[in-house]
Amino acid sequence: MLRTKDLIWTLFFLGTAVSLQVDIVPSQGEISVGESKFFLCQVAGDAKDKDISWFSPNGEKLSPNQQRISVVWNDDDSSTLTIYNANIDDAGIYKCVVTAEDGTQSEATVNVKIFQKLMFKNAPTPQEFKEGEDAVIVCDVVSSLPPTIIWKHKGRDVILKKDVRFIVLSNNYLQIRGIKKTDEGTYRCEGRILARGEINFKDIQVIVNVPPTVQARQSIVNATANLGQSVTLVCDADGFPEPTMSWTKDGEPIENEEEDDEKHIFSDDSSELTIRNVDKNDEAEYVCIAENKAGEQDASIHLKVFAKPKITYVENQTAMELEEQVTLTCEASGDPIPSITWRTSTRNISSEEKASWTRPEKQETLDGHMVVRSHARVSSLTLKSIQYTDAGEYICTASNTIGQDSQSMYLEVQYAPKLQGPVAVYTWEGNQVNITCEVFAYPSATISWFRDGQLLPSSNYSNIKIYNTPSASYLEVTPDSENDFGNYNCTAVNRIGQESLEFILVQADTPSSPSIDRVEPYSSTAQVQFDEPEATGGVPILKYKAEWKSLGEEAWHSKWYDAKEANMEGIVTIMGLKPETRYAVRLAALNGKGLGEISAATEFKTQPVREPSAPKLEGQMGEDGNSIKVNLIKQDDGGSPIRHYLVKYRALASEWKPEIRLPSGSDHVMLKSLDWNAEYEVYVVAENQQGKSKAAHFVFRTSAQPTAIPANGSPTAGLSTGAIVGILIVIFVLLLVVMDITCYFLNKCGLLMCIAVNLCGKAGPGAKGKDMEEGKAAFSKDESKEPIVEVRTEEERTPNHDGGKHTEPNETTPLTEPEKGPVETKSEPQESEAKPAPTEVKTVPNEATQTKENESKA
């Protein structure tokens, strides 16, 4: 109907007004959805006052100035139709109608086609998937005509990959079954419309997220408490995106945001948790949790905190002697649970053999005196039938694999006094002696001395003094007569009880004679083997005197020998003898009382002139480690002077070094620049006119070569050792001179002061008195060779009588006084070559008087 009507109108207008012509530019139009387009309606002709109108495809007249479809009258001859943001409903034939003043009309039409351009409606990027799941990549395409969709990856059609995991679904989505991390990348969704040759594509980024995996480097971590120690727990995590880490302790989160938390420190990625100043409270199960958008996983770490043992409880105890029992207790903490042991300063109780052992652990000593019970962290030590010797310090030690701790406790035992000391004490008239009464008591005891029932000291016994110390009382007696020898009583009293002990002061005697066992003669010497005197006289032997002479001589030669050195081997050596000569020798012993009986003479004959005895060798390694000083100790010369020593040496399994010849007076040989860490042997032979001695053999090993080597650039590298020593000596002497001059002018002392006093007669600052050691025995160096005894005078003891403080004696005070007698005698032999050199003999002060310890030798 519409077309017929339009045709009639057209014929009408053509027939009536051929002069009006209407054109629309463009004559046709295609618009894509969403695009805009305008059309111009132009009128040609002479008509005036024309009206130009636009009509929509549904025949409605379009109003001017609408929002989306706009009509604008430009002038009398044109009008514009504009379609903004076209949609499918806007398609159709639009008509431009021109009406003249006389009512005639002319029109033109334009067919507007609107199509949907190929577009991607729902194709987000990126699209993320979890590894292992079936991924569907979304790509919705809209167009007027159904498009053809092609999926590409890395420039290739995914279908051509022949990977069965890749499927294009009916809705043109791409499905990837069991997507992998390697499938990640850019996928292109490409649409094509063959009819229009239209093509469009969208690149979609596919991200494959990998669930985290986490593993603890150590599932169990050990630490030690209370050492200021830090421990680090580490978890290694993997996944995509990179997982974030968090930690829990026994299920409670450990926050990573507290800046003032000095206990827990996290690394930058929180994969490491450091626990500072570990203590027992830190022992727990720690869980590290790795989390990302694909999931989470955790791992557990058990922190085991061990603790060194610590003694937590001890208690001192007090008991009475003979009390039935007392128990000492020791408690300790630690992990692992410590074992507790007991000891004193003199015995290790826990390591002693036990008579029994039961559980709970109970150990009893063989004598049944001590019982140790242990259970868990507590141990007790029970002492039965308490003795005073049980008093003192007890140490309990707690030990485990981490360490140990010890704590002391004290057992106080109260007991009546107990007295000890040498019962028999030897001395002689005029010689001071100490009678020692050792006292063991708790509480402290009061000590008294008695003689024949009379309390000492008293006016009847002016030659007696008493010195007291916390552990002993000393009765100093200077016998004046036989009446001073005899019994003395020491009595100690405390609130527990009392105890007395009788001492006997015995008059000492000179020693009996030593017995000569045998004489080993050589050409010019003889070794005399002897036994000590059966009776020492109550005091120790100080020296031995050997006398000898050749048969036919009247006078005896003599020499003194120190008792300590002689008693070590029981041998004295006589020197300066003639070869092939018969001699007699005898011995006597000297103690503080005087020279004892002389032994019977023993005859012997020296050997003829012969080769010398081999020297005795002693080695002393040098500080550098590869040098040695070999000392040559001369033995018997065989009756003929030694001419020289022959020395040869070598490293074992090596060639001998050139022989060294030493003068007869040499007492050592230095071997230098030896091989490091090598074993050497040395042979030394003594030679006289009769021949060579047997070789003395000595073996030694040098040190390993040191690793540190001194720098060549040392300032002293160019100086010899002797030059360096000389420089040091000169510097030292100069310092001494400066110090001596300073002391002379400032303090009136020093070497210059000594010269001034002795040569110039100037009085020294110390000339007001002299020092004298109390009870010190010595032998003079003058011609008389008589023993001299220095004793304290009454004037020296005056301060003590005036109430001054007594000097506390020790084991060397007071000292004994030997009887006056010859110490060394020497005759003038007929032969000048046998003349012995004078010998100086000195006694050892602290050996002058001793109590008799073995009464069988009296």
UniProtKB/Swiss-Prot annotation:
The entry's keywords: Cell adhesion, Cell membrane, Disulfide bond, Glycoprotein, Heparin-binding, Immunoglobulin domain, Membrane, Phosphoprotein, Repeat, Signal, Transmembrane, Transmembrane helix
Positions of region (Disordered): 765-858
UniProt domain Ig-like C2-type: residue ranges: 20-111, 116-205, 212-302, 309-414, 417-502
Endpoints of the signal sequence: 1-19
UniProt-listed Pfam families: fn3, I-set, Ig_3
Subunit structure: Interacts with MDK. Found in a complex with SLC39A6, SLC39A10 and with NCAM1; this complex controls NCAM1 phosphorylation and integration into focal adhesion complexes during epithelial-tomesenchymal transition. Interacts with synaptic plasticity regulator PANTS.
Role noted for this protein: This protein is a cell adhesion molecule involved in neuron-neuron adhesion, neurite fasciculation, outgrowth of neurites, etc.
PANTHER family: BASIGIN RELATED, CELL ADHESION MOLECULE DSCAM2-RELATED
Protein name: Neural cell adhesion molecule 1
Organism: Rattus norvegicus
